[in-house]
Regions:
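A hydrophobic, multi-pass inner-membrane permease signature
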Residues: 2-300
Length: 300
């Protein structure tokens, strides 16, 4: 039997879909505009004529980027820090959240330890103290400065801890009776059950690692060791085609290509390539992301 829908309900649904469609277009427009700029010639971008489709279509911006090895080196550094940093952070977060999910009877002083973690969320060190600490630890001008400082995010520890606490104790007790130790319980039972939350942590951590520019600027003196975002931060101020033509590293054909380019074209191409990897990965993890946020926030 068909369910009748009232007129007010239909209007409400139409309004919701219209509103969400407009909101989606507002979110997508910057990406489309950026892509259009990267494929347009300076004749049109300099006059502000490019909106959602390229004008004076050209691939010169991407051809010029292909001749800049420092761009691809920075890209590789960002890929390495994202993979290694996310992997280490996930391992540390899991190994920290599991014991904190136990009661005070199992882990003596568990409450005090948890409050120490929470304290660090509200009272962090200043930039000067961070710099001094990293210098003492030998992290300045060291690739590890991209990985170690973010290896234990307290927010994610608390999120995963709350999820672990929501897992029925009977499951753990049955595993202990069967002869499992805590590492086996953690990685064979708790981790598989917690996939939605873990994928959420992976996504947040990977995005944070990929988008980080601050540590490269302040803790690396060698610009060739910059990750992509730090490199873009510097290059966006010096991507004038005239400067590139004067550095003597381009061929006559590439210099000819620069005549059709402006700084906006190169900037748009670099930014678009920089955000592309995360943009491509996110849709595949979206279902876990939404579920993980919801479950991780209410468990326990």
């Amino acid at each position: 039997m068909a369910i009748k829908t009232s007129t007010s309900r239909k209007i409400f649904v139409i309004f919701n879909y219209t509103f969400l469609a407009i909101l989606a277009l507002i979110c997508i427009f910057p990406f489309i505009h950026l892509l259009a700029l990267s494929f347009s010639s300076d004749e049109f971008t300099s006059k502000g004529l490019v909106s959602v489709y390229p004008m004076g279509f050209t691939l010169d911006a991407y051809m010029i980027l292909a001749t800049k090895p420092e761009f691809f080196k920075a890209f590789g550094i960002s890929v390495a820090r994202t993979i290694l940093g996310t992997s280490l952070a996930l391992l540390v977060i899991i190994l920290t959240a599991y014991p904190l999910s136990k009661s005070n009877k199992v882990l003596k002083g568990r409450t005090a330890i948890a409050w120490i973690f929470v304290f660090t969320m509200f009272f962090g060190g200043t930039l000067a103290s961070q710099y001094v600490l990293y210098r003492m630890l030998g992290l300045l001008d060291n690739f590890l400065v991209y990985i170690l400082p973010g290896a234990c995010d307290v927010w994610f520890v608390l999120m995963l801890m709350n999820f672990f606490r929501g897992i029925p104790k009977e499951i753990e007790e049955a595993a202990l009776i069967d002869g499992c130790n805590h590492f086996q319980i953690l990685f064979r039972i708790f981790v598989p059950i917690s996939v939605p939350v873990i994928v959420t942590i992976i996504l947040f951590t990977a995005v944070g690692q990929w988008n980080s520019w601050f540590d490269g600027i302040f803790f690396m003196s060698d610009t060739t060791s910059y990750p992509l975002q730090s490199y873009l931060y510097v290059m966006l101020e010096s991507s004038d085609p005239a400067k590139l033509a004067q550095n003597g590293t381009l061929t006559p054909q590439q210099i000819e290509q620069l005549k059709n380019l402006g700084s906006k074209n190169l900037q748009a191409a670099q930014i678009f390539l920089g955000m592309l990897p995360i943009t491509l990965v996110y849709p595949f993890l979206q279902k876990y992301f939404i579920k993980g946020i919801t479950i991780g926030s209410v468990k326990g």
